[in-house]
Amino acid sequence: MYEKIEGGSVIDIQGLKCNLPPEGYVFNIITKQVEFRGVYKRSEIQSEQYWKRIPLPSWYLDTMKKWDEFDKKKKDDEVEFYDEKLEEYKKQEWDRRLNGFWYMNNGEPTFLTGLHYLYLQWWPIDIGYPKFRIPDIEKFYFMEYCIQDPLCMGMLEVTKRRFGKSFVAGLFVSEYITRTKMTNGGIQSKTGSDAKKFFAKTVVNPFRRLPKFFRPEYDMSLGVNPKTEMRFQRQT
């Protein structure tokens, strides 16, 4: 969003010139290259082209159950569970989480940042999974620009109630620290009690419902539903 991308487009969000990759392409943050991924379509009929959570593969639930059963019996020195189809699916979803995702929206190719894709596809809120909204896509573009701008110290958001900002904030504080070593995230609220409620509702509950391949191990000595902190380390 911050750096210009050759062949891409620019959209102005509240004065920030956000740089989108060319249609069907993403900037791979690992290879540092612009790479083709294509544009996902849920239908060839334009009126049916809108965001809807992408269905899980037919084999997914059964394979995840086998993984859980394997881990319950596995000893520390044994090899990890492996399933070829699951590995490909994990790579796909990690790629979308890190690099973004294109899909067709009423005939218009639409780019979601990786954080926005994770929010829509995998981050449950109090009424199910989030819906796609234009103000949200602009917010995630703006947020990604701020993250990438080396001179930016943060952003301020002023909005009305019931606009989903709490769950987006919960995702924001969780996403980076769940994939980065030696990293902390914090929550500040009106009171300590309010912060605990926010933590339980917008961090712990959605985190526990993430797929296993997005969910690092955490210290269970604080409970399955910790009240004040999550430590991403194995319990000894």
Q: Where do the protein language model's features map onto the residues?
A:
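Phosphate/NTP-binding elements of NTP-utilizing enzymes
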Residues: 1-236
